């Protein structure tokens, strides 16, 4: 690491960062012409090529819960937390490897499976709705990850949803981030204290040290180059073409097709000029364009064409 004048690296449950600094003359020792173009810099020096790569720490887990529901809580909307933060922190505290334990920063939630099963005879009408919601989202419609409407007359109601995203372990009120919400639409089947059905749910998840860990699930390290490989680069905005005195904007680059130019589908466009109406002597209707006017316009167009040809 003699090529570096400065190196700072740290990783915790809240943040990971690497910062390096090196004098330009030290790059010449490696015979590497360094530029800052598209991130093509330190990765060309063999001694520090992998300095920005990091260990990939993943602990896979699955949580299963089964409980009976009293109908007093099912007669209205009721929320059941899917991610129990106390349980998660208890798991983390029991990880033997302290170095890996202190780097865990997020929980990647994969699949949530839910089964509702009635405690009464098959065929009794008991409609119920079930939804998985992201309570961090403010919009009521957009917070719904998945929803199902069913009837426990069939005894069981099964529901599965794939999330595929991560939540920081430092998220405020993490236990309420992902919720199971259910609502029954009948309150006269049993007394409120009776337990009309059970809820069994399983959550597949992973505790990891990076938001990118699952992308490298089968690798021991997280590679910086691959993270940025799929990043979209934003080009510099091109200046708007100047406006000519006649008010028309002339494009410097010809559009690839007509839709790109005016934003209207091709089948909505008429590429043929409107038919020219010429007044006849025996017509009762008067035309907006007379024959002498047309002849005069034609002569002007020819004169302009000849002028431009001579000038060009």
Curated annotation (Swiss-Prot):
Keyword Ribonucleoprotein appears in the UniProt entry: no
Region annotated Disordered, chain positions: 266-293
Keyword Disulfide bond among UniProt keywords: no
Coiled coil: 278-307
Keyword terms, alphabetized: Coiled coil, Host cell junction, Transport, Viral movement protein
InterPro entries: Caulimoviridae_Movement (IPR051596), Viral_movement (IPR028919)
Location of the protein in the cell: Host cell junction, Host plasmodesma
Pfam assignment, any one: MP
Function: Transports viral genome to neighboring plant cells directly through plasmosdesmata, without any budding. The movement protein allows efficient cell to cell propagation, by bypassing the host cell wall barrier. Acts by forming tubules structures that increase the size exclusion limit (SEL) of plasmodesmata, thereby allowing viral ribonucleocapsids to spread directly to neighboring cells.
Protein name from the UniProt record: Putative movement protein
Organism: Cestrum yellow leaf curling virus (CmYLCV)
